[in-house]
Design a protein with these regions (language model features):
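Short helix-to-coil transition segments within interhelical loops
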Residues: 229-235
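Junction motif at the cytosolic side of a transmembrane helix
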Residues: 5-10, 316-320, 393-417
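Short hydrophobic, aromatic-rich alpha-helical segments embedded in or entering the lipid bilayer
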Residues: 351-376
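N-terminal, intrinsically disordered, polar/charged segments of Gram-positive cell-envelope systems
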Residues: 38-135
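Aromatic- and glycine-rich beta-strand/loop motifs that create alpha-glucan
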Residues: 1-21
Length: 417
């Protein structure tokens, strides 16, 4: 325990660690605030002039105007009828034919509902959404019964021809059966905000990789490790203390910043929006059985597992590195490696490799969030595996394996010494 406290104190007292932790905390607040600036709203004042709002004011205005609560088939029908009435009034063929002031006054509150209805009733063979006048009141009453059919067509469009396609279809349908219906909706937390949670995860991983990289390598660089390895407690006990201290500091930083992001985001966008069904935010056929608020916490914990696996790899690399520069280079490359592999290596091999790398699931297009909301499957031996499930199932295995390799590597040095 004394070794652990001393190591904890040693790492925390370095100027670089303090600076990086401060940057991480600032990033959490900035990443929560930035999506707020993307929100806009326009309305007419008492004189008939257009008034535009952005940021927090726009959020509050939209929350006052837009539909919220449980989205029943009757509410869907009400939205369609409002749209079709205005379309007929202006002989419009698209939303661009509607005067802006009319759109914001009569239709904007219904826009999310109508967009999702068009997605649900898209052509099963082409994926093309129908025109506004192509939908009927009966369609709106059958909105929820249409969703499994839409899901089936999406899987067919994206996965047909792959060995194991039928299994992918079955997995998707089983997951979607667990989604609670009817959906709920309240304007607030946006898809952009959730994207920034993913970006924050990447940035925190990079910062913490920099913190963890010198934990073992700095002693090797200065020669202190040669002395430590010859002492009574310089073997497994010291290795365990260093590993525990590094995990404690980086883990606490990641969780603190993640919680700050969630609290600030929900405070800015409004806590009511945390009850919105994930399907209303991304796609009506998303497989996640969560509300937005639940997804925020699920993503924090899930990304934390992957983050922990990456830190374990960085520490393992630090054990074998002879100087800080080598350890830092390996650490940074390992964080971005899954993104590069995902973009450069084609086919099933590239998908599996980007998934199984230590930082698999952290990044941009390869990020866990997008694997959870999209229909990305991995195929092997005629079987289909939901990629998000593979990412989450493999993370604990990576952690145990990499921590074990780090300890084993340090013990080997002890024997050599």
């Amino acid at each position: 325990m004394n070794l652990y406290r001393l190591e904890l104190k040693r790492v925390c007292k370095t100027r670089m660690t303090a600076i990086l932790l401060a940057i991480a905390l600032v990033l959490a607040v900035v990443m929560a605030y930035l999506p707020v600036t993307f929100i806009g709203w326009t309305e007419l004042d008492a004189s008939g002039n257009k008034v535009s709002y952005t940021g927090l004011k726009a959020i509050r205005k939209r929350q006052e105007q837009q539909v919220s609560g449980t989205i029943t088939p009757d509410v869907m029908q009400e939205a369609l009828e409002a749209y079709q009435r205005v379309y007929r009034q202006y002989d419009a063929s698209s939303i661009n034919d509607i005067p802006v002031e009319v759109f914001y006054k009569e239709l904007a509150r219904y826009q999310p509902l109508v967009n999702n209805a068009k997605e649900a009733f898209a052509d099963p063979k082409t994926g093309m959404a129908p025109g506004m006048m192509g939908l009927t009141a009966e369609d709106m009453q059958n909105f929820y019964s249409q969703l499994p059919k839409r899901l089936e067509s999406v899987i067919w469009l994206e996965q047909d021809g792959k060995t194991g396609y039928e299994q992918a279809q079955a997995i998707a349908q089983k997951k979607f059966d667990a989604v609670q219906k009817p959906f709920t909706y309240s304007f607030g937390v946006s898809p952009d905000a959730m994207d920034y949670q993913t970006l924050l995860s990447l940035l925190l991983t990079l910062l913490c990789a920099v913190i963890a990289a010198p934990v073992f390598a700095s002693d090797a660089q200065t020669g202190a490790q040669d002395i430590q390895l010859c002492t009574k407690n310089g073997g497994l006990r010291l290795a365990a203390a260093k590993l525990a201290a590094a995990f404690s500091i980086t883990g606490a930083a990641y969780l603190l910043c993640g919680v700050v992001w969630i609290l600030v985001t929900n405070a800015l966008f409004g806590w009511e929006s945390t009850q919105t069904s994930v399907q209303w935010l991304f796609s009506v056929t998303s497989l996640l059985p969560y509300t937005v608020g639940q997804m925020e916490w699920v993503m924090l914990v899930a990304n934390f597992l992957i983050f922990f696996a990456e830190v374990a790899f960085v520490l393992m690399a630090s054990v074998w590195a002879k100087n800080n520069l080598t350890a830092l280079s390996v650490a940074l490359i390992s964080v971005v490696a899954p993104m590069i592999v995902y973009m450069v290596v084609p086919g099933s091999f590239g998908e599996w490799l980007s998934t199984l790398l230590p930082a698999g699931g952290i990044g941009f297009s390869n990020a866990l969030q997008y694997k959870m909301i999209n229909f990305d499957f991995l195929y092997a031996g005629g079987y289909a595996f939901f990629q998000a499930d593979v990412l989450l199932a493999s993370a604990p295995i990576k952690i145990v394996l990499l921590v074990g390799l780090a300890a084993w590597g340090y013990l080997r040095k002890t024997k050599v010494a």
